[in-house]
Amino acid sequence: MSGHSKWATTKHKKAAIDAKRGKLFAKLIKNIEIAARLGGGDPDGNPSLYDAIYKAKKASMPADNIARAVKRGAGDEDGAANYEDIVYEGYAPAGVGLIIECLTDNRNRAAAEVRSTLTKGNGSLATSGSVSFNFERKGQIVVPSEGVDFDKLFETAAEAGAEDVTDDDEVYTVITGPSDLFTVRKALQDAGFDYDSADQVMQPKNEVELSLEDARKVSKLIDNLDDLDDVQNIYSNWTASDEVMAQLDEE
């Protein structure tokens, strides 16, 4: 893997300054409920729940909200929604591929809103497999770069089985095989590294480099999709030069 992980960096910056805290919390609560439902309510024995709780704490979610979400997911408290996991594939302008992961209690609403948002942004839904063939499941650990020795991080991650570590300016991004995520995350913790998130992600095999104009269109469409209540994660295969990314950051 080479170059900058634009999407990881963009998501990190967005999370740090996200004014839409209510929507962010709703997504994090869904993650906690699903993790507790699938693996039980004890984070020590459920790595997915541990990471979901950790991510919520990093976003300054109140402890009471987290505790209630765990109880609902584990069945110890009423009120948990029956979420369905749905994945849509689509295209953004300039032929950029999108994978849109949803957690919804209303499949028809999710499909209608995703389709409408894509259409308004000059994108379209794609048939199953037509986009996902260009992506592969990976583990991704995002480590704030300030005060961190990159060489030590790289060595620790590699010894634990990581595939790659990239320098994305404000963060270092550790990439693992999907089954190695928790092992590498724990090794980094044991070595004293702080991290922002540890997630399963979809990483593109090939990327499309965009002009400033196309990058604006694609970024706006992704932001609008991310604002949908049912959308949990969006993965894309676009990249851009450092100059274009700098201009986007200024806007």
From Swiss-Prot:
This is Probable transcriptional regulatory protein Blon_1155/BLIJ_1182. GO terms for molecular function: DNA binding. GO terms for biological process: regulation of DNA-templated transcription. The keyword Transmembrane helix does not apply. It holds the Pfam family TACO1_YebC_N. One of its GO terms (cellular component) is cytosol. It comes from Bifidobacterium longum subsp. infantis (strain ATCC 15697 / DSM 20088 / JCM 1222 / NCTC 11817 / S12). It is found in: Cytoplasm.
